[in-house]
């Protein structure tokens, strides 16, 4: 018992330099994957976020919800379709996306954080029009436009609402839904929202939680550190593809635009968030410009 207590005290003491370094800093966290579907991991994530807030950091959560969207689409007889890692979103699918992301998933995360002593507030980009978007067209190899429905790209993010919540000790929980000039809702990739929000808020860190140990090479080995040049090479040779494309593109843009460090971590590891931010070892892949 005494040994266990001493070990816990040592862990807290080792975290002190990181707590001091990041006090008052903004940490944007993209929350997704298995960490959102496993009950123990969900509880652990909520506790981690509350702890970061209590020790003086400003965590901002941006969440996905792909599996939950797929489940509801299946229940209404629709099958999800993806092109270049982006969900094709017709009007009916957009209704499901708003119900799942802005309602079910967002409110569950808010409730879990509040259950563990935080003060979380759920938002979509339609609140205060703080995520302004326009219709996204993908490009074919022949440079032709591909219409994927109500999928948006970010025009601008107004940081005032999130900054206000941070300053009043609330924890913003953001669903990746943007709004056009005509009030049209747009489904936006959550990794892109997290990256652009981190840039706009001048965040110290952007943490992207995934279902892999981090960025892997073609042999399945973890790449613990990546530069912009190396990422360009991995794009070119196809090592980074599919759903990882928007994730790593967002990470690289954030690193190039003022976010001090970006981390792609394994959300299947309990307390991965604390391991990354409050220990020397860290986990996953660190990306710098």
From Swiss-Prot:
GO terms for molecular function: acetylglutamate kinase activity; ATP binding. CDD domains: AAK_NAGK-C. Pathway: Amino-acid biosynthesis; L-arginine biosynthesis; N(2)-acetyl-L-ornithine from L-glutamate: step 2/4. One of its GO terms (biological process) is L-arginine biosynthetic process. Its EC number is 2.7.2.8. Substrate binds at residues 65-66, 87, 187. InterPro entries: AceGlu_kinase-like_sf, AcgluKinase_fam, ArgB, Asp/Glu/Uridylate_kinase, Glu/AcGlu_kinase, NAGK-C. HAMAP family: ArgB. Belongs to the acetylglutamate kinase family. ArgB subfamily. This is Acetylglutamate kinase.
């Amino acid at each position: 018992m005494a040994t266990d207590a001493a070990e816990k005290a040592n862990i807290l003491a080792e975290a002190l330099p990181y707590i001091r370094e990041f006090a008052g800093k903004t940490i944007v966290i993209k929350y997704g994957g298995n960490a959102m579907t496993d009950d123990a991991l969900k509880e652990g994530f909520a506790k981690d976020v509350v702890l970061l807030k209590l020790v003086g950091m400003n965590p901002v959560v941006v969440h996905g919800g792909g599996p939950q969207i797929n489940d509801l689409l299946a229940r209404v007889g629709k099958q999800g379709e993806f092109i270049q890692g982006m969900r094709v979103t017709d009007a009916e699918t957009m209704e499901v996306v708003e119900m799942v992301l802005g309602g079910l998933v967002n409110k569950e995360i808010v409730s879990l954080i509040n259950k563990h002593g935080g003060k979380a507030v759920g938002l979509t980009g339609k609140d205060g029009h703080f995520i302004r978007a326009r219709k996204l067209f993908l490009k074919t190899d022949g440079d032709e436009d591909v219409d994927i429905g109500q999928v948006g790209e970010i025009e601008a993010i107004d940081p005032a609402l999130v900054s206000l919540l941070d300053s009043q000790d609330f924890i913003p929980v953001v669903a990746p839904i943007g709004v056009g000039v005509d009030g049209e809702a747009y489904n936006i990739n959550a990794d892109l929202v997290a990256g652009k929000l981190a840039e706009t808020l001048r965040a110290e860190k952007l943490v992207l939680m995934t279902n892999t140990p981090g960025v892997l090479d073609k042999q399945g080995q973890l790449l613990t550190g990546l530069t912009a040049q190396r990422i360009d090479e991995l794009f070119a040779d196809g090592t980074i593809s599919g759903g990882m494309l928007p994730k790593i593109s967002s990470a690289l843009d954030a690193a190039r635009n003022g976010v001090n460090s970006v981390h792609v971590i394994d959300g299947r590891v309990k307390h991965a968030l604390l391991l990354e931010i409050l220990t020397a070892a860290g986990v996953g892949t660190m990306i710098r410009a």
